[in-house]
Amino acid sequence: NTKKENLKTGSLAAIAGGITSVFDMPNNKPSITTKKLFMKKLQKAKGRMHCNYAFYFGAEKDNIEEIKKVEKIRGCCGVKVFVGSSTGTLLVSDQADIERIMKSTKKMISFHSENEDMLITRKKYAKTGRPHSHQVWRNVDTALSSTRKLIKSANKSKKKIHVLHITTAEEIKLLLRNRKYVSFEVTPQHLVLASPDCYKKLGTYAQMNPPIRGVRHRNVLRKTLQKGQIDIIGSDHAPHLKSEKNQIYPNSPSGMPGVQTLLP
């Protein structure tokens, strides 16, 4: 949505935040799930991006042939899989489909890890006008159960994967025991903010997926970072208009800017 940001302004924001290279996600409008759309995005980037860049290709359960077409193109940094639904329409929640994708590409696959079945059944916990209920809806188990399955599939497929924006102490413990095929990242938002204060002060502006959780989880993320055991600090850059974020929860979109504020 270029009303929020475009390739030029996004890359300038990255440079302002001290970032010289960006990997842009495929959950655009439309989602980048075909070679034609990927090439169109690459073409748009020429002469507009002010930093080094590459683009993720969006996986769907039925676009493996498109993945094979795109993976060798210069400018494709990897494949993105949304195991749980988030911002945009991309979703691959069936474990058999996930493993087929793992086996289909030599590119690194990065995962948004939340259990879609649990997100559906727990949606009743997202209370109208109460942004702090976001972490109740998308609770620890929705993330942990998904990440556990991804690790199992990676070990089975012997495929190296990357799990994005880890938020829970339980996931950290699990991931540190399973490093052979799995790398992972955390975001500044989850390292700095914590519930319930963030929701009291920021409301829907603190709403993101996976959600910001309590102090116990934040402290574990910080300690793991201090020990040098976290592979990447990722921005999870997801800007929205104020008019969108000011909507009553849960109609408000999840996500917040990240590249210009990655590190102080």
Where are these regions (language model features)?
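Gly-rich Lys/Arg/Thr-decorated short loops/hinges at beta-loop-alpha junctions or inter-strand turns
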Residues: 19-24, 50, 126-135
